[in-house]
Regions:
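Membrane-interfacial helical/loop segments at transmembrane boundaries in membrane proteins
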Residues: 58-62, 187-188, 397-411, 482-507
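Hydrophobic alpha-helical transmembrane segments
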Residues: 70-82, 197-208, 412-428, 502-524
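Hydrophobic alpha-helical membrane-insertion segments
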Residues: 36-48, 166-172, 376-388, 465-484, ...
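Hydrophobic transmembrane alpha-helices and their helix-loop junctions in integral membrane proteins
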Residues: 87-98, 103, 107-128, 138-458, ...
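Alpha-helical transmembrane segments
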Residues: 17-22, 89-90, 438, 523-533, ...
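Transmembrane helix-loop-helix hairpins at membrane boundaries of multipass inner-membrane proteins
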Residues: 1-10, 16-107, 182-191, 484, ...
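Aromatic-capped, Gly/Pro-kinked transmembrane alpha-helices
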Residues: 483-513, 531-652
Length: 652
């Protein structure tokens, strides 16, 4: 047994022991520490496999298992799980103190993380599906343990309903592939009719796409993530949706090959929709965690753009371009895992101190919580794609891959690549717009309520993880080639050219980017501005003049005011609603209440009609529950007759 295999086994055992210790009286902090250490060891094992480019354990089998193993792709996702989950579990040591059901939440969190590990190391359909279901149920348990409010229960109900939808597709695809022997014989599926391959591809896209949060199957995500404890939100958004993408990568690039021709265009269309619509809906949100959840939809769309571009480039015979697009998708998978978990953890710290995440009630937190605020600023720059942070590197590579696809991808690739590149460019601009708003409302400006003014920095166990994640975002952004090298070997189309992996990222025929030089330039400009400001001296303070009114935080920019121009321009798409209620005392206006919202059109036009139809059908089916023994015996006899008839037809 190899060293990496031993490290993986020891890590899983230590994490399991940590789950048990978490529920022991006064064992919460020790249990979470053991969980974090064990998960970190599994990540080390995954990194060893990626660097060594050699798998350990079993290969995928068509049997009923259980079998486990790690190849470089699994190793990459193991390392990513550890980089997100270890800081989240350390953060939970401070976050869960004083909360109700803290030991049970800690145990559910540990089970959740181990289920993520289990999915990526599973090497048979049954083990994969068992871990998949455990991964789906564990966060729901943690959410309900943290809160039993009506909104939380409704969010969990939507999440579990979407999980069932995803499960149907995943179970159908996995069990059918095992039945056909496609896990061991990669040519077995090629002999099947096109209809069978199309049905399996559709099941995989629906199943894994729903769990990943691709539009239009994303409705659970902006409900469940804000309802979860912040360390669970960090792992859900940081890694659970990425594990769904892991399953999609296995399906599209390995098990279902060769794919039907419609798969790549459909995936690219869903990805472009997720990018643009995700960031638009994020801009319209007033609650921080819900805003971050919609940005998860956006970034999953960016990853899916890279995967779709890889498929289209491979179909056009451009294998080097396909390798670049695949590597860009994997790099953004890692980058989003880091900066999104960072942002959710910072949001949890803000909520712990202030008691709300309403953007219009925050402000000035950079002064009262400087460490968390600085880390949040770093995460905001990363998710907005601002250099020198990691989000820019992967988005730049994805954009270059799409531009190259538009130039060299053949008739289909040219049109689709151009549309996708335009969608990504628009998404990047809107993301910057969104986080200018977020940073201004959350970190800067005056305190909007007394709780913000009285807030202070959280404990070391909560600041340490966010500083660590912010450092990773900066490090990968400055030297992305160090990470891109091992990631490049994950591509099924061969490694990236060596010229693309140095200090300067080079895309042959497209462009180059020197992140270290950009970082040095930004640092130099910052120092120069500080020196110039110091030499200029400070301005004399003067009272604010606002036409005789007393200065008040309500006069500052609001979340809705910041995006009003965009709402007006896109009103035909967003369909904003506004109500104004005026309370009169005789002829004197006593109060004016203004309410506005941007409805979620996917819910109103797609899911609510489906739900209403299902409920109507359920009411009809309830009529069969008559309470009559004779009726139930009749149902049994009819069912038995149908089964026997089907069996008879099958035998003949």
């Amino acid at each position: 047994m190899t060293t990496s295999a031993w490290v993986l086994i020891v890590g899983a055992a230590v994490a399991t022991a940590g789950i048990a210790v978490s529920v022991v009286p006064r064992g919460l902090r020790a249990g979470l520490a053991l969980q974090a250490f064990g998960v970190a060891l599994t990540g080390v094992a995954g990194a060893m496999v990626v660097i060594g480019a050699a798998g350990v354990g079993s290969q995928f089998s068509n049997g009923l298992g259980p079998t486990v193993g790690v190849d470089p792709l699994s190793g990459f996702f193991l390392a990513a799980i550890a980089l997100v989950s270890t800081p989240a579990l350390v953060y939970a040591r401070g976050y869960l103190l004083g909360s109700h059901h803290a030991p049970a939440i800690a145990a559910a969190s540990g089970v959740f993380v181990l289920a993520l590990v289990g999915v990526v190391v599973a090497r048979d359909a049954v083990t994969f599906l068992v871990m998949w279901e455990l991964m789906s149920v564990a966060p729901a348990v943690a959410i309900l343990l943290a809160s039993r409010s009506a909104d939380t229960c409704r969010a969990v109900l939507v999440y579990l309903g979407s999980t069932h939808l995803a499960g149907v597709g995943v179970w159908l695809a996995m069990l059918t592939l095992a039945h056909l022997g496609a896990f061991t014989d990669l040519h077995a599926l090629a002999a099947q009719p096109t209809l069978v391959r199309s049905l399996l591809a559709g099941a995989a896209l629906v199943g894994f796409g729903t769990k990943a949060g691709l539009m239009p199957l994303h409705s659970w995500l902006p409900r469940a993530h804000p309802a979860a404890p912040s360390h669970v939100s960090a792992v859900m958004s940081g890694m659970m949706i990425k594990v769904a993408l892991y399953g999609l990568v296995r399906m599209l690039f390995e098990w279902l090959a060769p794919l039907p021709g419609w798969v790549a265009p459909v995936l690219l269309g869903a990805a472009a929709l997720s990018c643009v619509a995700g960031v638009l809906y994020a801009l319209m949100q007033h609650e921080l965690k819900r805003l971050l959840a919609f940005h998860s939809v956006e970034n999953v769309g960016i990853i899916a753009l890279g995967l779709a571009a890889a498929l289209l480039a491979a179909d056009a015979g451009q294998l080097q371009l396909a390798a670049l697009a695949f590597a860009a998708a994997m790099l953004h998978t890692l980058n989003h895992a880091l900066f999104k978990s960072l942002l959710f953890l910072c949001a949890g710290s803000f909520q712990r101190q202030v008691g709300t995440l309403d953007l219009d009630r925050l402000g000035g937190l950079l002064r009262t919580m400087p460490l968390t605020g600085t880390a949040f600023l770093a995460g905001s720059m990363a998710i907005a794609g601002v250099p020198p942070f990691n989000g820019f590197a992967s988005e730049w590579l994805t954009l270059q891959a799409l531009v190259q696809l538009a130039l060299h991808g053949g008739p289909a690739g040219t049109a689709l690549g151009a549309l996708a590149a335009a969608a990504l460019a628009a998404t990047a601009a809107l993301a910057v717009f969104c986080f200018v708003k977020v940073v201004g409302l959350v970190l800067l400006g005056a305190h909007r309520q007394k709780a913000v003014a009285n807030s202070h920095e959280v404990s070391v166990s909560m600041t340490g993880p966010v500083i660590f994640l912010a450092g990773l975002c900066l490090a990968i952004g400055v030297v992305p080639g160090v990470v891109l090298g091992p990631i490049g070997h994950l591509s099924p189309y061969g490694p990236l050219p060596a010229s693309a992996l140095g200090i300067t990222l080079v895309v042959p025929g497209s462009g180059a980017f020197a992140p270290l030089a950009v970082a040095a330039f930004i640092a130099g400009c910052t120092v120069a501005l500080r020196l110039a400001r110091r030499q200029a001296g400070s301005a004399a303070p003067s009272p604010m003049w606002i036409c005789g009114q007393v200065p008040d935080s309500r006069l500052a920019w609001s979340s809705a005011g910041f995006t009003k121009s965009l709402r007006l321009v896109l009103a035909i798409v967003l369909r904003p609603r506004r109500t104004v209620s005026i309370e009169l005392d005789g002829v004197v206006v006593h109060s004016v209440v203004h309410e506005s919202e941007v409805p979620h059109l996917f819910d109103e036009l797609l899911f609510r009609p489906v739900v209403r139809g299902v409920l109507a059908a359920s009411r009809l089916l309830r009529r069969t529950q008559s309470g009559s023994l004779r009726a139930y015996l009749t149902y049994l006899l009819v069912t038995l007759a149908v089964v026997l008839a089907v069996a008879r037809i099958g035998v003949s």
